[in-house]
């Protein structure tokens, strides 16, 4: 279940919530985990805001066996903090910057000499900076830019190496055409890229030359306004091509042998209207 509420008081905004999860394992073990979250924002007029967030997530280490072959029942825990600001230098344009720190404790660590035995005393850390810019640059041109830098560390061994992409960038540009046959048509071009990073297995880096490759992907959209008719009002036909050059890439990984591959070249057609 999930409970959450938001409170406004003058220039202050407060958020508090908690999620409860019941977990059951195939070995008939049971655990219940609480995951609270808090947030606070201080507005300075209409153009500047400072914010801070904190959250905790936990879940049992079901599915992992200890040295005696019994299922681990204690829980891993993730604590996350974020601090940042948002500012609007000009109308309809927002820039935001934040620092985040994510610490995982009590994660499963492989026992030396075993292929499927663990103890739950691992600790990992990911910290970094996220920057974003979005809004209307001109009357016809809107832009979205997001960049994230992440530094990861295995606190159990003290090693510092990337287990997720250290640099990630997303960019979207949209332009609306005024006048002519294409009046009202909106063209969009997107770009997504991520750095390479080390593949891991059983919580450890496999080898210096065993990495998840970097990738760059381009997307394109066009939104065409349709003439009004008896059946269609404010109708827009949307055409999209994602991964234009049909790039083969790994989008995300849990570990080296459990990866989510990116979508191949994908075509999408949509119709938006009111009745």
Positions of PLM-derived features:
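Transmembrane beta-barrel architecture of outer-membrane proteins
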Residues: 1-2, 19, 33-36, 78-84, ...
